[in-house]
């Protein structure tokens, strides 16, 4: 009996205690909710009054005051104040800019997860073999913080902005992919992870605020003075090895008096010193090395060797039908008269061809007119990436020969580009388009594929590997279109090439079989034709559905990711055709495509081709034109300002860079381009938006915060024509250029 009574008493006590405790917790929660609600309503009311006061003018204040007084007299003061409070709360909730409660709840959960710590997260831990199990709802905020730790470790502590949130979203997705997380968990955890990247622990935020305060008011001034440089002679003396030349080939070198004059070129001290450039002299040692390593031989396995040669009759077997299809697509193409050819040019080039035309009226074109007159190209060479490279030589023929062959091939070029497009079934020969149109084409090509993959095809020394077989096949396409024996004879003179180089310190005479000459009228068109048809036939042979963007020897192949292993056969296939081809690392976003040393970036105008910023900020400060005076250099700066902004006015970093060039009423020198007047009005472009900064990061690896930091530094740099000296200094761009 006693035990039974004790049990009843204990049960009653526990029941009463449980009920009282539950009621107490409920009352506390209700009271807390009421207090929170009162705080929210009070905050909304205050925000509403602020909005009303900021919007009301004096006349509106008078009208509202009269309404308030009349309403108080009719219904009373208390109801009127209540109505005003309700209206103010509604206005504040809608337009007061207060963060909604559900957003504050998410932020609070993330902050609590940060407080619990993520010390057990190991960013170097091996990836799981199988997909993770379903993540419980309570653990999602903490897992989001762990993902945020890895994301921050990759791109750093970025400030709160829309562009940076897109960067964090992309990196968090990559982290989730490496963790092999379930698709549904990615959906629900991704926004929490992005929020965790931006809502960092309090101790981190305090240090970031301290850094920001320390940097305020401190900046460096970058002097953009004028620097003068001397031409460069290569330190490597190259000679053709024995057993490399064919029987009728050879190179004769005669030395003269040592050179006493050198090329002179200028640059402006830049904000960045990432790369160093040189310009080769027009000297005997440079011409000899350029001919040996860029015409006769290639460096393979550390030795000078003959370029690859195609197998016998391989071009006719592989590309015979393709060439005939191209010629049939082109159909009839009328040749120009000599006068029409000359009139298609302007400026000094037109005057040169006019003199050649007049001489052709007296003396017909001969074999000697096709001889090459070789010289060293004055171009900016990046010796930071490749110290002391072989100089590039230009090998033009006599203008008389160019007039004769050009009046056939110049009208053919646009027709041939369209024929290549029809062969592929879409725009393939990317020539003659604006940067906006090229960006649009590259983006549209990617939409063809479900899981697109983009692969660059690097043709090593493409001109040098154009063998006799390749040139004869190219010429057969032209001959099938024109069916003119005279053109056929002119084209044969491009196969057995004889050239000379007259220099102040010597003389070179050489003869080479095959090889594309850089000064020929059909150099660009021929490279488009050969490369497009080679890749087309390769895709047919291995059986892949692909799309090609071709700019001569620079190509990007679009294909499905599942077809990527089939490209392993490409180097051997091209090797049999006589070309040394390298398959570059595949990329999977449009911005990562590198085409003609540019990347497509989504700006306010859509996708636009943009050059690498580390190259622009160094190379575009070099002036290699001869006869530059102070006045011409000043006009050159004006032209850089106008031309740079026309292309990249709405582009991060580059727009700020070109705005620092001086602008003036004295425009740059007149162009020989026939429609130069179209550029006087300038390009129309919008503002730099968050999407542009995010796309720029995808293309070049420079985060939005880094972009803004570089732009702030550029505000303290201005190029000018005052001579001076400047020591290189490290900048943020030096650390971003490796991405």
From Swiss-Prot:
GO biological process: viral RNA genome replication
Name of the protein: RNA-directed RNA polymerase
Function: RNA-dependent RNA polymerase that plays an essential role in the virus replication.
Keywords: Nucleotide-binding, Nucleotidyltransferase, RNA suppression of termination, RNA-directed RNA polymerase, Transferase, Viral RNA replication
Lineage: Viruses, Riboviria, Orthornavirae, Kitrinoviricota, Tolucaviricetes
MF terms (GO), sorted A to Z: nucleotide binding; RNA binding; RNA-directed RNA polymerase activity
InterPro entries for this protein: DNA/RNA_pol_sf, Rev_trsase/Diguanyl_cyclase, RNA-dir_pol_PSvirus, RNA_pol_HCV, Tombusvirus_p33
Coiled-coil boundaries: none
Catalysed reactions, as listed in the record: RNA(n) + a ribonucleoside 5'-triphosphate = RNA(n+1) + diphosphate
Miscellaneous section: Readthrough of the terminator UAG occurs at position 223.
This enzyme's EC code(s): 2.7.7.48
Residues annotated as domain RdRp catalytic: 452-567
Stated family: Belongs to the tombusviridae RNA polymerase family.
């Amino acid at each position: 009996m006693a035990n039974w009574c004790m049990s009843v008493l204990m049960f009653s006590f526990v029941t009463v205690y449980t009920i009282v405790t539950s009621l107490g917790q409920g009352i506390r929660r209700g009271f807390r909710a009421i207090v929170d609600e009162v705080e929210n309503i009070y905050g909304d009311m205050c925000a509403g009054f602020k909005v009303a006061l900021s919007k009301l003018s004096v006349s509106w204040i008078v009208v509202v005051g009269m309404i308030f007084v009349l309403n108080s007299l009719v219904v009373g003061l208390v109801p009127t104040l209540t109505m005003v409070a309700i209206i103010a709360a509604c206005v504040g909730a809608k337009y007061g800019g207060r963060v909604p409660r559900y957003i504050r709840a998410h932020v609070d959960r993330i902050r609590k997860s940060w407080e619990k710590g993520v010390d057990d997260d190991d960013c170097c831990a091996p990836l799981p073999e199988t997909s993770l199990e379903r993540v419980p709802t309570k653990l999602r905020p903490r897992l989001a913080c762990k993902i945020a730790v890895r994301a921050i470790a990759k791109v750093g502590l970025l400030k709160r902005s829309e562009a940076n949130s897109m960067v964090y979203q992309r990196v968090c997705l990559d982290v989730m992919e490496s963790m092999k997380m379930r698709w549904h968990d990615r959906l629900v955890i991704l926004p929490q992870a992005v929020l965790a990247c931006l809502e960092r622990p309090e101790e981190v935020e305090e240090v970031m605020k301290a850094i920001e305060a320390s940097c305020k008011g401190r900046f460096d001034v970058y002097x953009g003075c004028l620097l003068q440089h001397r031409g460069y002679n290569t330190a490597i003396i190259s000679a053709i090895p024995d057993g490399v030349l064919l029987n009728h080939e050879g190179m004769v070198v005669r030395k003269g008096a040592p050179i006493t004059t050198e090329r002179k070129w200028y640059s402006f001290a830049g904000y960045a010193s990432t790369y160093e450039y040189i310009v080769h002299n027009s000297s005997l040692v440079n011409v000899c090395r350029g001919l040996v390593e860029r015409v006769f031989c290639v460096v393979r396995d550390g030795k000078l060797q003959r370029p690859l040669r195609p197998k016998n009759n391989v071009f006719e077997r592989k590309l015979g039908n393709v060439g005939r299809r191209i010629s049939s697509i082109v159909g009839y193409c009328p040749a120009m008269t000599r006068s029409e050819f000359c009139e298609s040019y302007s400026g000094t080039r037109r005057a040169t061809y006019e003199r050649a035309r007049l001489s052709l009226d007296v003396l017909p074109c001969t074999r000697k007119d096709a001889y090459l007159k070789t010289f060293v190209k004055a171009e900016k060479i990046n010796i930071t990436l490749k110290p002391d490279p072989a100089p590039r030589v230009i090998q033009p023929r006599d203008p008389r020969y160019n007039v004769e062959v050009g009046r056939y091939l110049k009208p053919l070029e646009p027709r041939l580009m369209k024929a290549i497009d029809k062969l592929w079934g879409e725009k393939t020969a990317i020539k003659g388009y604006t940067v906006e149109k090229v960006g649009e084409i590259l983006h549209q090509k990617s939409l063809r594929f479900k899981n697109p993959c983009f692969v660059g095809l690097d043709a090593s020394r493409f001109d040098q590997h154009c063998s006799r077989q390749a040139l004869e096949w190219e010429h057969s396409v032209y001959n099938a279109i024109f069916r003119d024996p005279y053109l056929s004879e002119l084209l044969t003179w491009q196969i057995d090439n004889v050239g000379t180089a007259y220099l102040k310190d010597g003389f070179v005479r050489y003869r080479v079989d095959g090889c594309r000459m850089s000064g020929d009228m059909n150099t660009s068109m021929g490279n488009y034709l050969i490369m497009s048809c080679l890749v087309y036939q390769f895709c047919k042979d291995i059986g892949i559905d692909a799309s090609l963007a071709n700019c001569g020897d620079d190509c990007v192949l679009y294909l499905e990711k599942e077809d990527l292993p089939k490209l392993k056969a490409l180097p051997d296939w091209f090797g049999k055709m006589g070309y040394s081809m390298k398959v570059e690392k595949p990329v999977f976003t449009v911005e990562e495509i590198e085409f003609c040393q540019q990347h497509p970036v989504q700006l306010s105008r859509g996708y636009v081709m943009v050059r690498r910023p580390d190259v622009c900020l160094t190379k575009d400060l070099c002036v290699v034109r001869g006869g530059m005076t102070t006045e011409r250099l000043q006009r050159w700066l004006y032209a850089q300002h106008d031309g740079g902004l026309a292309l990249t006015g709405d582009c991060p970093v580059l727009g700020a860079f070109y705005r620092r060039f001086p602008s003036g009423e004295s425009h740059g020198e007149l162009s020989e381009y026939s429609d130069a007047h179209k550029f006087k009005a300038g390009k129309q472009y919008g503002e730099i938006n968050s999407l542009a900064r995010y796309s720029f990061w995808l293309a070049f690896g420079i985060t939005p915060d880094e972009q803004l930091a570089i732009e702030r530094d550029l505000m303290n740099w201005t190029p000018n024509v005052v001579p001076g000296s400047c020591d290189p200094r490290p900048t943020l761009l030096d650390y971003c250029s490796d991405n």
